[in-house]
């Protein structure tokens, strides 16, 4: 799905690499890495089961769980999740709790402070309390399965976890609600954008912020948002902003759940070759081992489902149940707002201003247990809007601005029950009913049965009295406060449209003037545009849908050419190129000619694709580096981070904004305009290519600049580099940090397709592997199929189980 924040795998903080962990785990020469792999055959007695459960695995290690009761299936799911991904589960839980320093040391303390302030524990408690007794029982049984693994393998944990020295606590049912809340928290891109805007405000004046935070190509600049900050001196007035920005960067590097970027679509029967629906889904994240997603299939009386799960959460979040397919992407809804709070110390108390009066903050105490150090006890301060993300520094300084975070409440929220009901729905109408009850997470849910398709936006979105929430709001006035939430009946939805398809790619999904505030932080529109081009052309089957998932054509290239040829640009640009020094002039002319001939196909072997991407990279530096640089400055880093989260000022300036103040190069005495900067950028693209790819420009290849490289939780390379095509605007996403380098930061971490025209509709692929244990054969075995476009079928009919899963099984039996 799409990207926040803190979009999207797992921590590259200081847990030792698995190989090093294997060598240093106990100092015992007889320790065997293979002992950390639970068996996949034979008999395993486990206390807590009522009856035997069979676990078979396919060639990719994806499990089929067969049981005589749903409770036993959930118990087995907990055991299997822990067997495959215990390090991921433990790390996600610590991340959500704000306790990473316990495993990784003081380097994660700022991130822990950030997450303690966010207080997902409170949100998870509300969500779990509001759930039905049925759902709580499901989570309890799942937790017992996780704990059965922890009890049996306490001394045989995977090397990376064991070498950290951290002893995992037993799993609690509420921990699964916590993982769900973490998934939700990762879905809004706007919180890190708001933090980044404050970092930018330390370098540029408030009136320029609007030029750096556009919403969409056809939207006016958010000048009113910037106006609410007029007269407020932000430079140097936010204690702890550096630490907060560092924490936000750390969380972005961890990528939380890596689901802010994603695609999904459904093809209606009239556009299908078989006359039956199709559904496709792919979610994007860093090239990490393991990826976020874990495939599983469950077959029990009155319940069957297969698809993708997140270890720690006993739900099939996207997949197929034999009748209905469902998938999710991030809607990038904005339901997280930062409020600037005027603070001052009065005696021993910290106070903040509300409508001209000063009142005390609320206080809660937090204790941080830091690996290798004494515990640290600190206060978190809360205003009427929420906790101060910079509590420690604000209290120490006693003046300036606190940063309060407001998020929706989950009181009386039945989202967990609704997600389970979605996985049991037997037709699109029932699926639609279930999705309308999902409030605790902002998603585009696309679903289908053999004859119908549907789409529903879920979540809880605030009604703001004034403002859009795109930039931080003054908290001392009531003008910008929330006034309840949008009526769920206003949430966008559609079913069986005349066009014959539905699809989302994190793009804007509501028209101008829509009756609710959903977001102003949409992704760039190009993936959605390409999806519409392909979905709306001809008839489809699973082969054409696979081709869509692997498509590397960008629609941005055609827009760029249109801009070059626009009546007000063509002649001034030619004149600007002619005015360059001779050496630069010839380079600019070559780049222009090649770009005008470029077909938009970002193949890894394409020379023109290399020139195109070099131009994009160099133009960003030419436009913005003079005011936001140098390249290691906080402002530049914040700007790059914003460009990765939603529609970027880089693209916005290239396609328009001729009156932007950023076209002038502040380093020169004369005033430059857009044609002059574009001419420089064209020449710079060729110079950069000469430097990086050599002098034979016809032999350049995009894939020699742009690579796939998979890394483990410690940031060590485990596979690659391998030439990559595409970029952040292609359906087959291979994003890079625009303005930094061409290293792939985000790519599909899973894909699945449901073709109702097939006797066995579901097929899928994992981005790396099913297991998070480096000694497992299923640790990286998903990469080659991913590179080759190969999917594995997940059959729903029992007579086909042996063909895919074989006859070898692990039998879990009731223990004493």
Curated annotation (Swiss-Prot):
It is an enzyme of class 3 (hydrolase). Its EC number is 3.5.1.97. SUPFAM superfamilies: N-terminal nucleophile aminohydrolases (Ntn hydrolases). InterPro entries: Ntn_hydrolases_N (IPR029055), Pen/GL7ACA/AHL_acylase (IPR014395), Penicillin_amidase_A-knob (IPR043147), Penicillin_amidase_dom1 (IPR023343), Penicillin_amidase_N_B-knob (IPR043146), S45 (IPR002692). Residues 1-33 form the signal peptide. The active site is at 262 (nucleophile). Keywords: Hydrolase, Periplasm, Quorum sensing, Signal, Zymogen. Belongs to the peptidase S45 family. AHL-mediated signaling mediates quorum sensing in many species of Proteobacteria, regulating hundreds of genes, including many that code for extracellular virulence factors. This is Acyl-homoserine lactone acylase QuiP. It comes from Pseudomonas fluorescens (strain Pf0-1). The lineage of its organism: Bacteria, Pseudomonadati, Pseudomonadota, Gammaproteobacteria, Pseudomonadales.
């Amino acid at each position: 799905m799409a990207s926040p924040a803190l979009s999207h795998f797992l921590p590259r903080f200081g847990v030792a690499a698995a190989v090093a962990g294997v060598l240093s785990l106990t100092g015992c020469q007889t320790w065997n890495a293979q002992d950390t792999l639970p068996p996949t055959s034979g008999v395993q007695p486990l206390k807590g089961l009522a009856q035997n459960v069979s676990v078979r695995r396919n060639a990719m290690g994806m499990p089929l769980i067969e049981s005589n009761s749903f409770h036993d299936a959930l118990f087995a799911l907990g055991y299997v999740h822990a067997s495959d991904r215990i390090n991921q589960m433990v790390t996600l839980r610590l991340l959500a709790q704000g306790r990473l320093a316990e495993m990784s040391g003081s380097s994660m303390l700022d991130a822990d402070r950030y997450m303690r302030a966010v207080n997902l524990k409170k949100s998870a408690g509300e969500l779990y309390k509001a759930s039905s007794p049925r759902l709580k029982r499901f989570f309890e049984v799942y937790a017992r399965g996780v704990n059965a693994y922890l009890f049996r393998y306490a001394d045989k944990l995977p090397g990376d976890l064991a070498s950290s020295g951290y002893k995992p606590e037993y799993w609690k049912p509420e921990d699964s609600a916590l993982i769900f809340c973490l998934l939700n928290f990762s879905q809004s891109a706007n919180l890190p954008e708001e933090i980044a805007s404050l970092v930018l405000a330390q370098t540029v004046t408030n009136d320029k912020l609007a030029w750096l935070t556009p919403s969409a190509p056809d939207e006016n600049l958010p000048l009113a948002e910037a106006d609410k900050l007029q007269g407020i001196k932000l430079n140097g007035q936010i204690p702890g902003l550096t630490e907060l920005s560092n924490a936000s960067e750390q969380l972005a590097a961890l990528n939380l759940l890596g689901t802010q970027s994603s695609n999904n679509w459904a093809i209606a029967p009239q556009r299908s070759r078989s006359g039956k629906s199709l559904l496709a889904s792919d979610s994007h994240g860093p090239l990490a081992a393991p990826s976020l997603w874990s495939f599983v299939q469950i077959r029990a009386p009155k319940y069957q489902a297969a698809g993708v799960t997140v270890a720690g959460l006993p739900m099939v979040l996207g997949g197929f149940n034999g009748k209905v397919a469902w998938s999710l992407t991030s809607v990038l809804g904005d339901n997280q707002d930062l409020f600037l709070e005027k603070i001052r110390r009065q005696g021993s108390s910290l106070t903040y201003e509300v409508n001209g009066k000063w009142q005390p903050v609320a206080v809660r105490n937090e204790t941080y247990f830091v690996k290798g150090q004494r515990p640290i006890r600190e206060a978190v301060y809360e205003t009427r809007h929420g906790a101060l993300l910079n509590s420690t520094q604000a209290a120490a300084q006693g003046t300036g601005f606190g940063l309060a975070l407001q998020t929706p409440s989950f009181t009386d929220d039945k989202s967990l029950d609704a997600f389970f009901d979605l996985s049991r729905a037997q037709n699109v109408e029932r699926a639609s009913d279930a999705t309308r009850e999902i409030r605790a997470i902002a998603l585009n849910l696309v679903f289908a049965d053999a004859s119908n398709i549907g789409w529903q936006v879920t979540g809880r979105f605030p009604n703001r009295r004034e403002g859009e929430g795109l930039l931080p709001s003054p908290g001392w006035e009531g003008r910008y406060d929330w006034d309840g939430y949008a009526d769920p009946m206003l949430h966008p939805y559609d079913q069986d449209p005349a066009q014959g398809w539905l699809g989302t790619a994190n793009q804007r999904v509501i028209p101008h003037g829509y009756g609710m505030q959903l977001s102003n932080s949409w992704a760039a529109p190009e993936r959605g545009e390409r999806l519409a081009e392909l979905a709306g052309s001809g008839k489809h089957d699973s082969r054409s849908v696979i081709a869509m998932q692997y498509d590397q054509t960008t629609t941005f290239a055609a827009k760029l050419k249109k801009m070059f040829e626009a009546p007000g640009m063509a002649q001034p640009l030619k004149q600007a190129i002619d005015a360059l020094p001779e050496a630069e002039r010839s380079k600019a002319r070559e780049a222009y000619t090649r770009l005008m001939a470029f077909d938009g196909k970002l193949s890894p072997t394409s020379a023109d694709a290399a020139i195109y991407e070099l131009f994009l990279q160099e133009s960003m530096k030419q436009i913005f580096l003079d005011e936001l640089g140098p390249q290691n400055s906080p402002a530049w880093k914040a700007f790059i981070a914003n460009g990765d989260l939603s529609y970027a000022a880089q693209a916005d300036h290239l396609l328009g904004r001729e009156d932007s103040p950023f076209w002038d190069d502040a380093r020169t005495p004369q005033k430059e305009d857009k044609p002059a900067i574009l001419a420089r950028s064209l020449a710079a693209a060729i110079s950069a290519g000469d430097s990086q790819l050599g002098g034979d420009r016809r032999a350049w290849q995009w894939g020699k600049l742009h690579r796939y490289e998979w890394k483990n939780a410690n940031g060590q390379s485990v596979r690659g580099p391998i030439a990559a095509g595409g970029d952040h605007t292609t359906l087959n996403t291979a994003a890079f940090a625009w303005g930094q380098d061409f290293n792939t930061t985000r790519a599909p971490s899973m894909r699945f397709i449901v073709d109702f025209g097939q006797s066995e509709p579901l097929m899928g692929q994992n981005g790396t592997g099913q297991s998070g244990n480096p000694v497992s054969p299923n640790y990286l075995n998903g990469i080659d199929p991913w590179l080759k476009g190969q999917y594995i079928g997940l059959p729903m009919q029992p007579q086909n189980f042996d063909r895919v899963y074989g006859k070898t099984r692990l039998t879990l039996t009731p223990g004493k």
